Design a protein with these regions (language model features):
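Perimembrane helix-loop-helix junctions
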Residues: 2-6, 187-203
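Short helix- or helix-capping micro-motifs
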Residues: 127-133, 176, 180
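Membrane-interface transmembrane helices that cradle and orient dolichyl/undecaprenyl
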Residues: 150, 155-170
Length: 203
């Protein structure tokens, strides 16, 4: 009797961990923010729309800080490097990016839960579903299509070791720096690194 190849076991585990919260997120997204539609599926991912319009204007040589979105009339308020990092959003249908963005936020959420000690496998999947349904900041981040959960995952990955003892691939501080160039708020953790004596990570 042969054992299941490790990559197959890992794929099944990821499916159990990610698919339930992703499916629940997709189901509730049209109802989180006003003017969403359950069918055809059209959530009001307002912030994601801002990112897409800003990137398209950047590639067209326009001022991204003058970019506004239709109906909501919102502006891009992130550092310019954030628009550069979001360049792929200019290509492909918006519906595709709504799904990809939601999947990315769910992956980030599950990564944080795992590093905070939630057991892997179906328990992580169920906790992820509960977080999507019950934790308002996570739910609205998904509904607006914001970047906050991804930035949180970067910072947490810098601060907390992997629960399974996975070796750190990047020097401590790199992911916090990346989060800070996308949105300035995570820069507070640079100060935190200084305060706990990790000056190298802060720099």
């Amino acid at each position: 009797m042969t054992s299941t190849p490790s990559w197959q076991a890992q794929a099944r585990r990821l499916l159990v961990e990610l698919l339930p919260p992703f499916a629940v997120a997709c189901a509730i997204l049209p109802f989180v923010i006003a003017h969403g539609k359950p069918w055809p599926w059209q959530p009001s991912t307002i912030d994601l729309q801002v990112y897409v319009y800003a990137v398209k204007d950047m590639l067209a040589g326009k001022d991204i800080f003058a970019t506004t979105t239709p109906f909501w009339n919102l502006y891009f308020i992130y550092p310019p490097i954030a628009a550069v990092l979001m360049t792929p959003l200019a290509f492909g249908p918006y519906l595709m990016w709504q799904l990809v963005w939601t999947a990315g936020l769910i992956w980030a959420q599950q990564s944080v839960l795992r590093r905070c000690g939630v057991p892997r496998g179906w328990k992580l999947g169920l906790v992820g579903v509960a977080v999507v349904l019950a934790v308002e900041p996570i739910r609205t981040t998904l509904g607006y299509g914001q970047v906050n959960t991804l930035l949180m995952a970067f910072v947490v990955a810098d601060l907390l070791p992997d629960a399974e003892g996975e070796r750190r691939r990047l020097p401590q501080g790199v992911l916090t720096g990346l989060a800070t160039v996308i949105k300035l708020t995570p820069g507070l953790f640079v100060v935190f690194f200084f305060l706990i004596g990790k000056k190298r990570a802060a720099l």
